[in-house]
Amino acid sequence: MGYVGNVSYPDTIPGQGNLVFEASFESGNLGRVDKVSCSEYDLFIRPDTLNNKYRVWFYFECKNASENQRAIFNIVNFSKQRTLFEMGIAAPVVKSNAQNSWARIPSRHIYYYRSSQHNDRWILSFAFIFESPDPVQFAYCIPYTYGQMQIWLNELESRKYPFFHRDLLVQTVQKRRVDLITIDATPDTFQGSKKMIFLTARVHPGESPSSHVMHGIIEFLVSKDDRAQKLRKVYCFKIIPMLNPDGVFLGNYRCSLMGHDLNRMWRTPSDWAHPSIYAVKNLLTQYDNNPQAQTVIYVDLHAHSQKPNCFLYGNVNMSAVEEKSTFRQLWLPHLLADLSEDYSLEFTQFNTDVEKAGTGRRTMGDLLSCLCYTLEVSFFSYRHTDSSGNGIQHCTPYLQYKYEALGEAFCRALLNFYEADCGLREIVLERPFKTFLPARAQKTLKKQARKVIQTVMMK
């Protein structure tokens, strides 16, 4: 295994109508281009650095088309075969100079199929009509780069908000910043009642939707909205908006510079190989052990390729056999479902899956005294019922504004959670906790309950 580079524009551009490709830019990913015909191209995703297992994220630019030239692009080497492309509710994104914002490619121009010409692999093909020779960019989902985040954080810092503070938590292996954002209207107040909310995102570099949601969260928290002002008074927010800057910069899908899935390193992180995970884990445990602070919630933001909508994953702990504890775990999912049409209680789940061991949610759930969740949002689309009252469901593509709107809805749900915690809001749950458990977790919970009962009887 080794690093495979991205394609670059040739030194000499051929005659107009001969497309040329470029991915040697921040977060770019396209390892090879094979010209099948004058209008069709096979495109090969570059694998993650030092890890050939992951080939999902792509982000490239092409130019030199003739006016109204048609082209078909085939992504031929996806490592993840089962995605929402198979269900017809997924679309890559495109951006041109004429329209300087990302848009979804129309579904009628997208095909996902098994190809006998490619060893019976699943191929994603999409057609596009170029309006001019100017560059056009294509990506798996709406990009959010490390450089883009740094420019935005610099701008936020320049506003001189008294409640906003930016620190360098640690540097990555390639010496990029891992930023720690603190948002708190009363930063000097630690008198036994300080409630803490911890948020992280982008441990998987290809999951750009999580950054757009985090962008929406932070922009709402620093806004003049009355609800944002109240949130800043009742909570201290500690936010790490990008856990894997090296992977994001390199255009990886899952891994860090060294080929590690950082979301499997939380149990025993290395201070030199996984510096962001090492530093964040220490930060979380430090505040959780501080008697003057009360850690309430930790949420790690991700993106999902095999399900639509957004939803939460939670943990099943020993305390989950207590009705009061399980009831409180369900508050945030229900509050978010009330505020956001794209939130799915159907996909919300509390699990103990072995393959999730070592993740932030599972590891910190074992170490911390607070509620720990993963917030997942689809790369592509969400299903929702229309307002006609007929129960008709529609599928709507996610665009940047909708990801950011989810961030705002999440903040509002946190405020409602605070009110419920203080007895100012009543939450009625129609579904018991066990209905949010997969079959395997239900068996685990029953075993835990029996052990608790046996322990009580022996006393």
From Swiss-Prot:
Organism field: Caenorhabditis elegans
CDD domains named among the record's database cross-references: M14_AGBL4_like (cd06908)
Gene: ccpp-6
Enzyme Commission identifier(s): 3.4.17.-
GO molecular function: metallocarboxypeptidase activity; tubulin binding; zinc ion binding
Protein's name in the database: Cytosolic carboxypeptidase 6
Cited Pfam families: Pepdidase_M14_N, Peptidase_M14
Coiled-coil intervals: none
Disruption phenotype: RNAi-mediated knockdown at the L1 or L4 larval stages or in the egg-laying apparatus causes a reduction in egg-laying due to a defect in the egg-laying apparatus muscles.
Enzyme class: hydrolase
